[in-house]
Swiss-Prot record:
PANTHER family tied to this protein: HEAT SHOCK PROTEIN 90 FAMILY MEMBER (PTHR11528)
Organism expressing this protein natively: Bordetella bronchiseptica (strain ATCC BAA-588 / NCTC 13252 / RB50) (Alcaligenes bronchisepticus)
Kinase found in the keyword field: no
UniProt-annotated location(s): Cytoplasm
Name of the protein: Chaperone protein HtpG
Length: 635
């Protein structure tokens, strides 16, 4: 942010570059839903009052005899202004510059990089990012903020002003009481907002759940003027009690949706929600939502996450990540505890037994919500899985107590339909298992295409055995914790000596034994030629169309995981693969008859192509091409 003009009374500063970009995008992308400006500004006013109430726990003098917190909305037809006022914590000069001139949050660059130019898609992203105060400029061509922070003198107030074009001014001001007035100077085409009925309708639709009273001047019909006229008496236009404290039967779905948009600053409706009052060892109320879209910063370790924490209806903090496990970090909402102390800190949250009980109970409640969605709203669950499936997979390692429940919620691609969409559950797989099959088979790879085309699948396709196709980065980590489902082991088709004995008849078993003996000389010859590169060479039953493949030991890291570790700059052990050959392939017959002079090249070529098929990089591509060309010329 750059300073452009300064004098003793006022200074003009430039908006942070990201703010300029956001203002432009927001005005053009969100205009069709312009009424959210009032929701956002009322939400900010409510937050300011919550913060004052919290700070006043330790500093009661901040209330200065005015403990009745409220929000007021007013309009002036002649001046063409709407004013949103609160008597909350207020802003100092430095806070005004930081909060109204910059976007001080992580993930800003990632947010802008995801914008597409498509108004509808960008509107959703902007909603996820949270437009807050800047939504004022959707309907206003100038915004004035008069604010005095609690604890400061009347002459220490500030006046902030901007037309949203790139700069703002800030100057000292006088203000009788603490709090903030946001004055919107409306654009020429926004006359419909200069109407008490219209403003009340917007407030009741978007902000009825705000726990503070929202007040407007009472209006009566003036027959002489032929219009509603404001009087001196104020009336409360919202219900003014926290939504989560009401009985569920008294809350409409629309009210639940609007509350979600307020606490999450999301532009879209939630996918699902759960509202419960818990009594017993720990007493608390939870209103938790599953969003419809993943936030752009879902994978940002420094991103804000967690739910709002209240204690006995007193706001304590945003983003209380300790109240839910990390794998449920996409959940938004409110938890109101009756047991935690009002002066609770983040450090206390980490150590509190009550918080552990809340976290465990909330995790179970969210999992129940997802189970219900998976069973009764398949389309909604498919949307959830597309957005948050990879995050939920983390729960298999993070939440041992709920691992089995999480496993039932997982979805995968599989050879059953060959589609990339992850729609197959473990229960689906088990329900389709062959007679005599007692294992769940899977393959991991860098991409879905690589997994679907893996040579390790050939025998399974031939026998009609389903294999799960895993290509998410989190899958290998998940599998290190998830070893079985419903008593059936999870087995990689690319690890160890594949044992399909339970699916083979006696004649097939006899043939396999005879083939292994017949090809023993070739196996020994290949083992000698490739002694530096492979741990073992053996005949396999897992191949049908490919001449060879590489596998690793049952307890060794998979090649896919080794590549991920190396790409992340972490140390990875050197693992020699096992080369398995297909005795029925014509190329193996050709190598079996190769002269000693050519055998070394054939052996190296066989290993390199097996590595390439697995997704690995070969050590010397130039040598590979040279060998290939030489052997082709001799063919």
């Amino acid at each position: 942010m750059s300073q452009t003009t300064t004098n003793s009374a006022s200074e003009t500063l430039g908006f942070q570059a990201e703010v300029k970009q956001l203002l432009h995008l927001m005005i053009h992308s969100l205009y069709s839903n312009k009424e959210i400006f009032l929701r956002e500004l009322v939400s900010n006013a409510s937050d300011a009052c919550d913060k004052l109430r919290f700070e006043a726990i330790d500093q009661p003098g901040l209330l200065d005899g005015d403990g009745e917190l409220a929000i007021r909305v007013d309009y002036d037809k002649a001046a063409r202004t709407i004013t949103i006022s609160d008597n909350g914590i207020g802003l100092s000069r430095d806070e005004a510059v930081a909060n109204l001139g910059t976007i001080a949050r992580s993930g800003t660059r990632e947010f802008f990089s995801q914008l597409t130019g498509d108004k509808q898609k960008d509107a959703q992203l902007i909603g996820q990012f949270g437009v807050g105060f800047y939504s004022s400029f959707i309907v206003a061509d100038k915004v004035t903020v008069l604010s005095r922070r609690a604890g400061l003198a009347a002459n220490e107030a500030i006046r902030w002003e901007s037309d949203g074009q790139g700069e703002f001014s800030i100057a000292p001001a006088e203000k009788a009481g603490r709090g903030t007035d946001v004055v919107l100077h409306l654009r020429a085409d926004e006359d419909e907002l200069l109407n008490g009925w219209k403003l009340r309708e917007i407030l009741r639709r978007y902000s009825d759940h705000i726990s503070l009273p929202i007040r407007m001047a009472k209006e009566d019909w003036d027959a002489e003027k032929g219009e509603q006229v404001k009087g001196d008496e104020l009336e409360t236009v919202n219900q003014a009690n926290a939504l989560w404290t009401r009985n569920k039967s008294d809350i409409t779905d629309e009210q639940y949706r609007e509350f979600y948009k307020t606490v999450s600053h999301d532009y879209d409706d939630p996918l699902a929600w759960t509202h419960n009052r818990v009594e017993g060892r720990s007493e608390y109320t939870q209103l938790l939502y599953v969003p419809k879209h993943a936030p752009f910063d879902l994978w940002d370790r420094d991103a804000r996450r967690g739910v709002k924490l209240y204690v006995k209806r007193v706001f304590i903090m945003d983003d209380a990540e300790q109240l839910l496990p990390s794998y449920l970090r996409f959940v938004r909402g409110v938890i109101d505890s009756a047991d935690l102390p009002l002066n609770v800190s983040r450090e206390i949250l980490q150590e509190s037994r009550d918080v552990r009980a809340i976290r465990e109970g909330s995790a179970k409640r969210v999992l129940s919500l997802l189970e219900d969605m998976a069973e009764n709203k398949a389309e909604d669950y498919a949307t959830f899985w597309t957005e948050f499936g990879q995050v939920l997979k983390e729960g298999t390692g993070e939440d041992a107590a709920n691992r089995e429940r999480i496993a039932r919620l997982l979805r995968f691609a599989s050879t059953h339909d060959g589609e990339q969409a992850q729609t197959v559950s473990f229960a689906d797989y088990v329900g389709r298992m062959k007679d005599g099959q007692d294992k769940i088979y899977y393959v991991t790879a860098d991409t879905f295409t690589a997994a679907a085309n893996s040579p390790h699948l050939e025998i399974f396709r031939k026998k009609g055995i389903e294999v799960l196709l895993l290509s998410d980065r989190v899958d290998e980590w998940m599998l290190s914790y998830l070893r079985e489902f419903d008593g059936k082991s999870l087995v990689s088709v690319a690890k160890g000596g594949l044992d399909l004995a339970e699916l083979a008849d006696e004649e097939e078993k006899k043939r396999q034994s005879e083939v292994a003996e017949t090809f023993k000389p070739l196996v020994e010859r290949l083992q000698q030629a490739l002694a530096e590169q492979v741990k073992e060479v053996r005949v396999t039953q897992r191949l049908v169309d490919s001449p060879a493949c590489v596998v690793v030991g049952q307890n060794e890291l998979s090649p896919h995981l080794l590549r991920m570790l190396k790409a992340a700059g972490q140390e990875a052990p050197e693992v020699k693969p096992v080369l398995e050959i297909n005795p029925d392939h014509a190329l193996i017959a050709r190598i079996r008859d190769a002269s000693d002079a050519e055998f070394g090249d054939w052996a190296a070529l066989l290993l390199d192509q097996a590595l390439l098929a697995e997704g690995a990089q070969i050590a010397d591509p130039a040598a590979f091409v040279k060998r290939l060309n030489g052997l082709l010329l001799k063919a």
